[in-house]
């Protein structure tokens, strides 16, 4: 037998002696076809034909032998069982022979990431991989036929081996490698161990991972591959991103983006109602499908309260398009196809607007037409309403700048107004309030009852509150036609704000105080002291606004909060606790709020003629922050969850960060004191005694 065989005993078995003896061995001719050696590069399941020469690995108790060359017939007998055992679907297609024990292949049925059949079927070789395979094939062709067959044979054995055997083979190979070879392995493995984990993981886990990324990282992830782009651009990921940033400041990055267009919100709700009327989707309410649009609107002198809690939470409740594909396939025709905007597009649109706010990039429109100072304004969608000391109200088209109509009827200057889809209510120094159909210019009704001029009003649902020079606040109930008078201020009442959710009213007065009233008991439940000038505006912040306690910096030495009509401060400075009241009282607003009644808005913002703006916490009565920057008294104020906008006697308009107190930007342009401000998500408008209205647009 012309085959050479080397045997080493395990007690003396050192790799060193093995290497020395291997140098004298001769290769035997292997009759493996050339195409078989080439094909073995591309598939781990390719194996050598049974007729080919093979190597026999035998483990004995104290010795092992390595066969370098043997007859083809003997090699086939030794290797074929090994191949049939580990890849039976190719070498034993009809099953095992009768009487042969069948070992469990459980350990061999678990695939690693690179060899998972489902991934291998989907995986496409990229250009670097194809180039590498072609280089290996060309390099293999340069070798002698005998060497090609030997290398291909070694690859086939390794490919057919299970994980445990492969590990042993690799350990033996690396134990015999020199440093240049180990360095080559290290450099090659560095790229090979990089796995496409997003493709390997279930989509739910991939979405969870991507939700931790910021917008820049998400955009970079979308450039990796088509699969990554599909995952990174999915509505599940960007809906979460919008939840974190739109209409609120993100706690991680500090960015906050404005809400969406209220007009688009209403259109989307109408589409949903039409679809709901056409086929039954009883499990989904229309409030849960408010769509991608959300409000971007204005206020008169201050940020108006959202029309409903559903609209305010529409952003969170909107279903993602990827979650409700059923709606797109239920009916034929474009009429029944959902028209949701992708959340990434929504975020992109809002991000552009937020960036314009941050850097002051805006367009300016000037509205001229009044003949006396403008004292109040409000805008909604493309409608702007302004009231002036010339006793007129003008309705404007904000898109074209055209004056649509003029409402006449008051006998004196108009100090306040507010409108919705159906009506406009105005207050005048002639002591009356008028209700108008602003679309036609018709005066529907006139309300009288104050003994002085009406200089402030606010309505919400069926409740109207008016503030007057006669030092009182009057409540008008449109539903039951009842009225009541709230007395307590000792000077002009300049502003009022109704919160129907908690059934409370805030008022600001020239007596330098702010009061909180209970509409159920018709009593004052809180008085805030702190300003040293006449308080002109009070704005409750939206309930989504969050303020970190450690950001509070206002000194409370000159601030006092009283409960009820008592002029004394509450014990320990805790509002809602009179001198004889126990601290165990559950609600800081009194026993009327103990039975599940919603509490008033947690934060309010006020401005006064002492040139300052203050941020208050209503539950504790603390002044959390004082904003300094205006040179003269602050007449106008507007606020939302992202910013505060103020206008003052110094003819300047300032934008503030309510959390830090920093003045982010100052706008000039008016030639008279700024008397009123309307704030939207993508724009704001200012009115002045110079008879002009200036609208600043930050749209993308």
Curated annotation (Swiss-Prot):
SMART domains: FBOX, WD40. The keyword Zinc-finger does not apply. Component of the SCF(sconB) E3 ubiquitin ligase complex involved in the regulation of sulfur metabolite repression, probably by mediating the inactivation or degradation of the metR transcription factor. Pathway: Protein modification; protein ubiquitination. InterPro entries: F-box-like_dom_sf, F-box_dom, G-protein_beta_WD-40_rep, SCF_subunit_WD-repeat, WD40/YVTN_repeat-like_dom_sf, WD40_repeat_CS, WD40_repeat_dom_sf, WD40_rpt. Residues 282-313, 556-598 are annotated as: Disordered. Keywords: Repeat, Transcription, Transcription regulation, Ubl conjugation pathway, WD repeat. GO terms for biological process: protein ubiquitination. Residues 195-241 form the F-box domain. CDD domains: F-box_SpPof1-like, WD40. PANTHER family: UBIQUITIN LIGASE SPECIFICITY FACTOR/HREP PROTEIN, UBIQUITIN-BINDING SDF UBIQUITIN LIGASE COMPLEX SUBUNIT. The keyword Transcription regulation applies. Gene3D superfamilies: 1.20.1280.50, YVTN repeat-like/Quinoprotein amine dehydrogenase. This is Probable E3 ubiquitin ligase complex SCF subunit sconB. Component of the SCF(sconB) E3 ubiquitin ligase complex. WD repeats lie at residues 369-406, 409-448, 450-486, 488-529, 583-626, 627-666, 669-700. Belongs to the WD repeat MET30/SCONB/SCON-2 family.
């Amino acid at each position: 037998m012309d085959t050479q065989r080397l045997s080493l005993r395990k007690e003396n078995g050192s790799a060193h002696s093995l290497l020395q003896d291997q140098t004298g061995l001769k290769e035997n001719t292997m009759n493996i076809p050339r195409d078989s050696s080439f094909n073995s590069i591309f598939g781990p399941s390719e194996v050598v034909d049974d007729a080919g020469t093979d190597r026999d690995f035998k483990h004995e108790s104290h010795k092992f032998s390595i066969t370098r060359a043997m007859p083809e017939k003997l090699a086939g007998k030794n290797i074929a069982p090994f191949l049939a055992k580990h890849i039976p679907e190719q070498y034993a297609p009809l099953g095992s022979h009768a009487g042969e024990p069948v070992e469990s292949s459980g350990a061999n049925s678990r695939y690693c990431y690179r060899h998972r059949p489902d991934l291998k079927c989907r995986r496409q070789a990229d250009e670097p991989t194809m180039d590498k395979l072609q280089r290996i094939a060309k390099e293999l062709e340069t070798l002698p036929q005998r060497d090609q067959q030997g290398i291909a044979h070694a690859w086939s054995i390794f490919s057919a081996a299970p994980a445990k055997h492969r590990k042993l083979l690799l350990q033996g190979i690396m134990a015999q490698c020199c440093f240049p070879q180990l360095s080559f392995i290290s450099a090659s493995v560095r790229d090979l161990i990089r796995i496409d984990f997003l493709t390997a993981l279930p989509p739910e886990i991939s979405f969870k991972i991507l939700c931790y990324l910021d917008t820049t990282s998400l955009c970079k992830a979308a450039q990796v591959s088509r699969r990554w782009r599909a995952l990174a651009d999915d509505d599940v990921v960007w809906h979460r991103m919008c939840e974190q940033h739109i209409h609120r400041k993100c706690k991680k990055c500090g960015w906050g983006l404005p809400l969406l267009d209220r007009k688009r919100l209403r259109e989307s709700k109408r589409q949903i109602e039409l679809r709901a009327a056409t086929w039954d989707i009883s499990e989904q309410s229309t409030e849960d499908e408010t769509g991608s649009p959300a409000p971007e609107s204005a206020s008169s002198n201050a940020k108006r309260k959202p029309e409903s809690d559903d609209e305010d939470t529409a952003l969170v409740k909107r279903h993602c398009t990827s979650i409700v594909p059923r709606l797109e396939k239920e009916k034929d025709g474009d009429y029944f196809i959902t028209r949701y905007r992708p959340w990434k597009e929504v975020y992109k649109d809002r991000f552009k607007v937020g960036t314009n706010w941050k850097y002051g990039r805006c367009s300016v429109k000037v509205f001229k037409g009044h003949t006396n100072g403008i004292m109040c304004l409000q805008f909604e969608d493309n409608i702007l309403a302004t009231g002036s000391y010339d006793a007129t109200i003008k309705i404007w088209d904000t898109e074209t700048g055209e004056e649509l109509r003029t409402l006449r009827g008051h006998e004196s200057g108009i100090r306040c107004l507010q409108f919705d889809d159906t009506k406009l209510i105005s207050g005048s120094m002639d002591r009356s309030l008028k209700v108008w159909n602003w679309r036609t210019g018709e005066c529907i009704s006139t309300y009288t009852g104050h003994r002085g001029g009406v200089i402030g009003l606010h309505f919400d649902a069926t409740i109207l509150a008016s503030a007057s020079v006669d030092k009182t606040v009057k409540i008008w109930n449109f539903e039951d036609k009842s009225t009541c008078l709230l007395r307590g201020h000792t000077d002009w009442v300049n502003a009022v704000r109704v919160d129907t959710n908690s059934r409370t009213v805030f008022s600001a007065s020239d007596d330098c105080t702010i009061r909180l009233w209970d509409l159920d008991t018709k009593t004052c439940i809180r008085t805030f002291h702190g300003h040293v000038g006449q308080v002109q505006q009070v704005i409750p912040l939206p309930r989504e606004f969050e303020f970190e306690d450690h950001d509070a910096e206002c000194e409370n030495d000159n601030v006092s909060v009283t409960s009820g009509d008592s002029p004394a401060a509450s014990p320990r400075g805790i509002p809602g606790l009179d001198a004889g009241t126990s601290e165990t009282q559950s609600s800081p607003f009194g026993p009327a709020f103990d039975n599940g009644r919603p509490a008033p808005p947690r934060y309010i913002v006020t401005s006064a003629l002492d040139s300052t703006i203050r941020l208050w916490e209503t539950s504790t009565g603390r002044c959390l922050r004082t904003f300094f920057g205006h040179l003269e008294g602050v007449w106008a104020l507007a606020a939302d969850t992202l910013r505060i906008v103020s206008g003052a006697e110094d003819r300047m308009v300032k934008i503030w960060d309510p959390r830090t107190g920093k003045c982010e930007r100052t706008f000039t342009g008016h030639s008279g004191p700024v008397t009123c401000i309307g704030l939207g998500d993508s724009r704001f408008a200012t009115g002045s005694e110079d008879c002009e209205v200036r609208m600043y647009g930050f749209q993308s």
